[in-house]
């Protein structure tokens, strides 16, 4: 394990960064939302469960198309604008729900959140696979994925519940997502592996654009 950390520690940090915002958003909007709706918004839990069903159905339908976009434009090139936009939209989205809670508003917010979750998570498999060399890929992906999901996903409902009890604010979930986004951006942007992955995405995109401009010659 020490050898792995010495050789692949930077890549593991980048991989954790890739996962943090996606897993935090998923657990909050899917696992924690029914509790939030009932305790904080005082709406029937059925609204949150229905929204979760709609969001899951959207994931099933949209993931292939989102993955295609990642392949075309580069998952790391799209990661930054998507995560930044999601962080900016999160607080207004919760304000939209909290200001006058209703089933319709909740469903609208869950649909918007689902679109961002698809855009963020669709690139995860490809992004993680390219970070580690073949001899360390399984260990690297497994370790990074499980650490990120456990600390920032599985612990999210407990963390948000405790912070809500301490602060009394109904906007704690929004600030949790924003914090997760900042952690993701920092770990991907400021690791050598993340910088190299972004450069590779840009180079691949430039090569595709160059090939597209070449004249086509008819076959003999």
What are these regions (language model features)?
Residues 135-166:
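A late C-terminal transmembrane helix in Major Facilitator Superfamily
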Residues 179-208:
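Multi-pass alpha-helical transporter architecture, strongest
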Residues 103-119:
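Hydrophobic core of transmembrane alpha-helices in multi-pass small-molecule transporters
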Residues 84-101:
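C-terminal ends and interior cores of transmembrane alpha-helices
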Residues 160-179:
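A membrane-interface helix-boundary motif in multi-pass transporters
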Residues 9-58, 152-157:
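Extracytoplasmic gate region of multi-pass secondary transporters
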Residues 71-84:
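Cytoplasmic membrane-interface "Motif A"-like loop-to-helix N-cap segments
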Residues 119-132:
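Intracellular juxtamembrane helix-capping segments at the cytosolic ends
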């Amino acid at each position: 394990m020490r050898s792995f950390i010495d050789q692949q520690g930077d890549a593991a940090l980048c991989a954790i960064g890739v996962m943090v915002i996606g897993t935090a958003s998923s657990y909050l909007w899917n696992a924690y939302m029914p509790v939030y709706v009932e305790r904080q918004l005082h709406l029937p839990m059925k609204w949150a469960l229905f929204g979760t069903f709609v969001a899951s159905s959207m994931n099933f339908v949209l993931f292939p198309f989102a993955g295609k976009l990642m392949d075309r434009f580069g998952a790391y090139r799209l990661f930054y604008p998507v995560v930044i936009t999601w962080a900016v939209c999160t607080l207004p989205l919760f304000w939209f729900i909290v200001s006058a809670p209703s089933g319709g508003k909740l469903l609208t917010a869950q649909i918007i959140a689902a679109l961002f979750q698809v855009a963020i998570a669709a690139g995860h498999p490809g992004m993680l696979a390219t970070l580690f060399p073949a001899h360390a890929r399984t260990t690297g992906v497994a370790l990074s994925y499980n650490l990120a999901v456990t600390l920032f996903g599985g612990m999210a409902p407990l963390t948000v519940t405790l912070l809500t009890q301490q602060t009394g604010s109904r906007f704690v979930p929004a600030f949790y997502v924003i914090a997760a986004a900042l952690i993701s951006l920092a770990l991907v942007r400021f690791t050598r592996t993340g910088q190299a992955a972004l450069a590779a995405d840009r180079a691949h995109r430039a090569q595709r654009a160059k090939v597209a401009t070449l004249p086509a010659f008819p076959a003999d």
